[in-house]
């Protein structure tokens, strides 16, 4: 007797095979669900409660406000994140009339009375409400109505999500577009292929992906999530014997267009608008090459020649940072003046290139003598009056025998001394060089060279290693014998000399295309992101996040408040009940999905005879995508060496809460009583945790005793002294 095949299976030539078909059907909203949506909307409005508190700059709001100011000034800047969020906030402010010359410098500064900070926070809050509603519509695709409502309310009451959606930050909009991606992709998988609704959800998913990767660099994780799920789905389509190769190609091409081409088009368009709004030099100029900067309206062209006596700035070719010195000294070793790399244009980056003989100002300023390959020179630091110097002492960080400390020492009047002399070895030229002359004579922005110390025969170099706090966390500069060549390469970015005022001899650049700008900007973004290694009091490790070991002090007016101002503290902290539920359910899901996958590895295993899928199978089919989403949005942080903070866990937490919904739905399907008890326990616990921490979520009044009693974990460094005033 032939065994009855379950729904979705057909008999192939040798074995049953699973067909590709929508596994779920969309159901219309019932009256109960319509009432639930209305109720959820009302509950989510609590995110907008007293948005005006505090009327001061909170945490990373300072960065967004400065970027808005840069847009008004047209001053170019560089950030680790793509510019969509900053552009949205900027265009919102353009709807209002206020003094564009506002000055906001640090966290805690009062917002000017006419600055529309409340409207900017309102936008973030509306994104938070949209995130809540989209979560409900996502959940009802695979969960029963009650579980969908419960989990959606958990999103409403998740303290960390509430906090970020009340402030001028990127996290609120980012969570909204991430939820837009998740909902539309899930809806897309339930549609009949090539219908109107199928096309709609397909392309809205692509648009949402474009917005997501244009808001935050972490949007790439969600992009990867869609990519993985799409590959799995295409594999299933390929295995369906009823689908022709041409239909498969159609599926493939449409997904490539929607999930790759559409997002990348949006992404590039956002950067184009970004560049158009920043035509002038600005705080980001120091990170950019002269070729890029030559496209800016107020870029000052530099003399092409470099003469002895020229005041120059020297940049590291790989790191794009300035050779720099200042009055600070090394705390050990020579105890002489520090030499470092610095990110920004500064007077302390200026050096005078001199001959190796005793300084003769009249000769240097009147003789037009060019610096050539093989010349031996000295570099005089204008701001501090000392010469670049190497001595036989180990550097403060790289304490190897083949390494030497680089410092500033001696002043004008110095006689010939090899410890202060460097041979210029010209190696290659920049791509924008017009001829081979930069390989013979030192040319501004064109010649890439090494500086070889005459006494020790070591190469002046720098690397990504940074000095501690006594060195202002600037990059270490040292001298090394036989180093890696890229670390030893330098170029002259700017040059000035009294004899070089002929405008016909200024350096001109060929056209720098939009794509070249885009590539260079991303190199800078990558280096900036990698360079966030300076110690921070509220940095944490990814392993601390799921168990909420510590939070982040977003704001305290302890030292800021006026006489009639109430104490206010915002401490970024998640909902303990939700975080722990997500953590333990994640462990359970990993175990269950691993077991189920192992059982299903045999392609010749007979499918279950029941025409109705078991709760276990439903749990696996609906939970593994969210488990993958949590994994992709969390694990990469464990591999990063940069500073990380609890708010980096938000995207993973969002997937974790969706995973929690599948587990509760599974428990209720298995046993309504046990499932109901687990669901009710988590729900009530989450409400309790939210209520207990409302004051530090919203910045509302509290007391010292109440604050101290809410330090549930030893690492929760909540500044309760805020409430003593």
From Swiss-Prot:
Sites carrying sugar chains: 409
Reactions catalysed, as given in the entry:
a di-trans,poly-cis-dolichyl beta-D-mannosyl phosphate + L-seryl-[protein] = 3-O-(alpha-D-mannosyl)-L-seryl-[protein] + a di-trans,poly-cis-dolichyl phosphate + H(+); a di-trans,poly-cis-dolichyl beta-D-mannosyl phosphate + L-threonyl-[protein] = 3-O-(alpha-D-mannosyl)-L-threonyl-[protein] + a di-trans,poly-cis-dolichyl phosphate + H(+)
- UniProt pathway: Protein modification; protein glycosylation
Principal place of residence? endoplasmic reticulum
Highest taxon, organism lineage: Eukaryota
Q: What does this protein do?
A: Protein mannosyltransferase (PMT) involved in hyphal morphogenesis and drug sensitivity. Transfers mannose from Dol-P-mannose to Ser or Thr residues on proteins. PMT1, PMT2 and PMT4 account for most of the protein-O-glycosylation activity, while PMT5 and PMT6 may specifically modulate a much narrower spectrum of target proteins. Required for biofilm formation.
Q: What is this protein called?
A: Dolichyl-phosphate-mannose--protein mannosyltransferase 5
Question: What species does this protein belong to?
Answer: Candida albicans (strain SC5314 / ATCC MYA-2876) (Yeast)
Gene designation: PMT5
């Amino acid at each position: 007797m032939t065994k009855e095949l379950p729904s979705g299976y057909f008999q192939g030539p040798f074995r049953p095979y699973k067909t590709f078909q929508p596994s779920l059907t969309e159901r219309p909203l019932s009256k109960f669900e319509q009432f639930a949506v209305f109720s959820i909307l009302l509950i989510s409005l609590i995110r907008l409660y007293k948005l005006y508190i505090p009327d001061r700059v909170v945490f990373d709001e300072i960065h967004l406000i400065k970027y808005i100011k840069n847009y008004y000034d047209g001053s170019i800047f560089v950030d680790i994140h793509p510019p969509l969020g900053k552009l949205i906030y900027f265009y919102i402010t353009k709807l209002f009339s206020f003094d564009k010359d506002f000055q906001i410098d640090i966290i805690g500064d009062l917002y000017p009375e006419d600055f529309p900070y409340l409207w900017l926070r309102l936008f973030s809050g509306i994104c938070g409400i949209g995130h809540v509603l989209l979560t409900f519509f996502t959940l009802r695709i695979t969960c029963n109505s009650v579980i969908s409502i419960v989990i959606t309310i958990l999103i409403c009451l998740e303290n960390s999500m509430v906090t970020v959606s009340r402030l001028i930050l990127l996290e609120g909009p980012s969570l909204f577009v991430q939820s837009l991606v998740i909902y539309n992709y899930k809806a897309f998988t339930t549609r009949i292929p090539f219908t109107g609704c199928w096309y709609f959800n397909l392309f809205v998913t692509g648009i949402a992906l474009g917005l997501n990767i244009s808001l935050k660099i972490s949007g790439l994780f969600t992009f990867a999530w869609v990519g993985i799920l799409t590959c799995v789905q295409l594999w299933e389509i390929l295995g369906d014997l009823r689908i022709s190769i041409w239909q498969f190609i159609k599926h493939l091409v449409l997904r490539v267009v929607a999930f790759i081409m559409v997002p990348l088009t949006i992404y590039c368009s956002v950067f184009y608008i970004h560049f158009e709004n920043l035509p002038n030099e600005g705080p980001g100029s120091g990170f950019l090459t002269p070729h890029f900067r030559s496209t800016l309206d107020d870029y000052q062209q530099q003399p092409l020649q470099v003469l002895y006596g020229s005041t120059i700035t020297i940049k590291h070719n790989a790191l794009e940072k300035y050779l720099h010195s200042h009055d600070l000294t090394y705390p050990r070793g020579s105890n002489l003046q520090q030499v470092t790399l610095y990110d920004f244009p500064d007077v302390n980056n200026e050096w005078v290139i001199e001959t190796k003989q005793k300084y003769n100002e009249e000769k240097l300023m009147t003789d037009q003598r060019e610096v050539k390959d093989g010349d031996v020179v000295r570099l005089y630091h204008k701001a501090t009056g000392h010469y670049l110097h190497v001595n036989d002492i180990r550097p403060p960080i790289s304490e190897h025998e083949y390494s030497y400390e680089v410092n500033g020492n001696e002043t004008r009047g110095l006689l010939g001394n090899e410890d202060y002399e460097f041979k210029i070895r010209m190696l290659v030229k920049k791509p924008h060089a017009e001829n081979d002359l930069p390989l013979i004579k030192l040319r501004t922005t064109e010649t890439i060279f090494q500086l070889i110390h005459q006494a020790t025969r070591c190469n002046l170099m720098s690397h990504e290693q940074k000095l501690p706090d006594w060195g202002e966390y600037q990059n270490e500069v040292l001298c090394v014998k036989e180093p890696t060549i890229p670390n030893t390469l330098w170029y002259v970015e700017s040059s000035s000399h009294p004899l070089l005022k002929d405008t016909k001899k200024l350096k001109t650049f060929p056209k720098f295309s939009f794509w070249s700008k885009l590539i260079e900007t991303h190199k800078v973004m990558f280096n900036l992101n990698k360079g966030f290694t300076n110690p921070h009091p509220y940095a944490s490790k990814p392993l601390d996040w799921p168990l909420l070991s510590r939070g982040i002090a977003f704001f305290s007016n302890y030292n800021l408040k006026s006489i009639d101002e109430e104490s206010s503290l915002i401490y970024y902290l998640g909902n303990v009940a939700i975080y722990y539920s997500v953590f333990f359910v994640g462990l359970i899901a990993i175990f269950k999905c691993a077991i189920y996958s192992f059982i299903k590895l045999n392609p010749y295993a007979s499918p279950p005879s029941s025409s109705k899928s078991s709760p276990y199978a439903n749990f696996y089919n609906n939970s593994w995508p969210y488990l993958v989403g949590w994994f992709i949005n969390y694990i990469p942080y464990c591999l990063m060496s940069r500073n990380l903070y609890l708010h980096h866990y938000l995207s993973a937490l969002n997937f974790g809460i969706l995973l929690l919904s599948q587990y509760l739905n599974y428990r209720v399907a298995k046993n309504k009583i046990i499932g109901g008890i687990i669901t009710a326990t988590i729900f009530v616990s989450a409400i309790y945790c939210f209520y207990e921490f409302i004051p530090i979520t919203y910045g509302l009044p509290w007391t010292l005793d109440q604050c101290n009693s809410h330090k549930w974990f030893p690492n929760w460094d909540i500044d309760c002294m805020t409430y003593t005033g």
